[in-house]
């Protein structure tokens, strides 16, 4: 017999086996589980921290085996087959959605051909270093584009609340298979870190090639190849090698679009082919707020010393719109995530140790389609696709941020000065590289966004006393939390509603947010492709 139980410990009791066993036995009695002298074997499943009160508690969950031995491994089996030549599937994008789609295809021996505009991890790391130290941006290989997608060099956070979308444990298990620490299988908020994730992505890509798949780096998808009989159908893609300039046509049985939230050219490509395949969706924009780590730790841990950096999650409703923290990076860094030279875009990341001197989070507010100014709707309509209005507006805000910056030095303002609407004569030390420049965010950010952020920060300070302080720094602008465009797909077949054999997938298509949910969507879409090919 087996059952699952939860116990509560103090941090000092976490490694006290006698205390743990006593609490487990007590929980079994409380749940009226009959053990009758049988051997009890607990297997640890998950840990989370409850820091809501002054006395911090650890919530530990166990699977308890009563009178039987634990299973050797109750994780999913990974059965990959070498690709056959019978079927081929093109995957545009090598982020988590694309990679996990590829591994799902290997379960049926189907060959994936991955098209990736950016560099493999080692060269991509060089591109990123040049951006941070010299301010030089490679528009196709950066924090957003390249091997492993945006998450490879921007945090490696795996936590998702979208567990109903797929088997998240299988997602974690595959990461562990390629070198991720096993604790991601049990942590409540699993995190790999940008110092470890590139090696894991390398191992994944090596396996894809070993199994007979292909990965084409530095290769841009420039167009779909379509044919029309009864309906429009995608049969391949046109590509361009960004190093040699060579153009090529690649044909396949199906195409999975897993391009991420920053591939504006893909939306514009689809708008030319079939504008009704796109729809506008709600997204969010705002700023990064960065504190010295010790301030957040003191607030969240009530002055107690803990080995890890503290996290937080904040939400508010202001003027009928949500304002919330996103991608909180304890012990992390703020990083530049623009994909064009005339943009400033920021994001956050942490290494596996989460041990920098700062903690940061995006603070963003909803931007619904009806919030987009009419001039952008008119521009998108004139260009044949009204659904792109939010994308045009987002680009405008990123350009506006650049115009209030100094090259890749991001505009910044102390949080207290933002609330008081005054100049920041000095700025606190920051993790952001290349650097920051003092700017009146309160003057040039769109008024509705500024007002909502100001009101939300005051509300957040009620929940986290000391959140508003002179050392807190706002860095603009955070605009890539999600895409403003959705590529429409059928709820059952997951095929694009307007273009047959085209399968929108992941964050860039509007169906996920973050590594975990994107990987699950990749598996889900690949399963739909497999079902289609079996018919």
Q: Residues of each region from the PLM?
A:
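Residues forming the flavin
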Residues: 1-58, 62-153, 157-174, 178-535
């Amino acid at each position: 017999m087996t059952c699952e139980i939860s116990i509560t410990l103090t941090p000092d009791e976490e490694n006290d086996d006698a205390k743990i066993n006593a609490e487990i036995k007590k929980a079994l009695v409380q749940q009226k589980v009959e053990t009758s002298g049988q051997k009890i074997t607990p297997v640890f499943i998950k840990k989370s921290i409850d820091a809501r009160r002054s006395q911090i508690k650890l919530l530990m969950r166990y699977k308890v085996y009563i009178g039987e031995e634990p299973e050797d491994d109750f994780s999913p089996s990974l059965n990959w087959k070498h690709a056959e030549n019978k079927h081929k599937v093109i995957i545009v994008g090598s982020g988590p959605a694309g990679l996990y789609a590829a591994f799902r295809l290997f379960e049926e021996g189907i060959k994936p051909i991955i098209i990736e505009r950016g560099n493999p991890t080692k060269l991509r790391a060089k591109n990123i270093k040049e951006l941070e130290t010299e301010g030089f941006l490679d528009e196709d290989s950066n924090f957003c584009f390249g091997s492993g997608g945006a998450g490879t060099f921007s945090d490696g956070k795996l936590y998702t609340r979208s567990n109903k979308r797929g088997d998240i444990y299988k997602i974690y298990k595959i990461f562990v298979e390629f070198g991720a620490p096993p604790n991601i299988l049990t942590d409540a908020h699993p995190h790999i870190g940008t110092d470890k994730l590139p090696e894991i992505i390398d191992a994944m890509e090596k396996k894809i090639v070993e199994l007979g798949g292909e990965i084409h780096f530095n290769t841009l998808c420039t167009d779909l190849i379509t044919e029309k009989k009864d309906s429009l159908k995608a049969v391949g893609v046109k590509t361009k090698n960004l190093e040699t300039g060579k153009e090529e046509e690649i044909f396949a049985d199906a195409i999975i679009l897993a391009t991420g939230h920053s591939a504006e050219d893909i939306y514009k490509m689809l708008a030319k082919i079939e504008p009704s395949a796109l729809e506008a969706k709600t997204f969010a924009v705002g700023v990064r707020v960065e504190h010295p780590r010790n301030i957040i730790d003191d607030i969240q841990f009530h002055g107690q010393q803990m080995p890890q950096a503290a996290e937080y999650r904040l939400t508010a409703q202001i003027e009928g719109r949500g304002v919330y923290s996103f991608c909180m990076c304890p012990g992390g860094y703020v990083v530049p995530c623009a994909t064009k030279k005339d943009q400033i875009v920021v994001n956050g990341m942490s290494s596996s140790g989460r041990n920098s001197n700062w903690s940061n989070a995006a603070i963003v507010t909803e931007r619904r389609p009806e919030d987009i100014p009419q001039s952008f709707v008119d521009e998108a309509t004139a260009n044949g696709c009204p659904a792109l209005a939010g994308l045009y507006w987002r680009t405008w805000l990123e350009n506006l941020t650049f115009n209030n910056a100094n090259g890749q030095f991001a505009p910044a303002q102390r949080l207290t000065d933002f609330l008081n609407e005054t100049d920041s004569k000095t700025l606190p030390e920051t993790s952001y590289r290349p650097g920051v420049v003092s700017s009146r965010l309160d003057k040039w950010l769109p008024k509705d966004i500024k007002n909502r952020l100001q009101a939300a920060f005051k509300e957040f300070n009620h929940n986290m006393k000391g959140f508003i302080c002179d050392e807190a720094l706002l860095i603009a602008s955070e605009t890539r939390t999600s895409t403003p465009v959705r590529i429409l797909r059928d709820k059952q077949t997951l095929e694009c509603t307007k273009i047959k054999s085209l399968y929108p997938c992941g964050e860039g298509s509007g169906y996920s947010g973050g590594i975990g949910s994107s990987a699950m969507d990749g598996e889900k879409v690949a399963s739909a492709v497999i079902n289609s090919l079996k018919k």
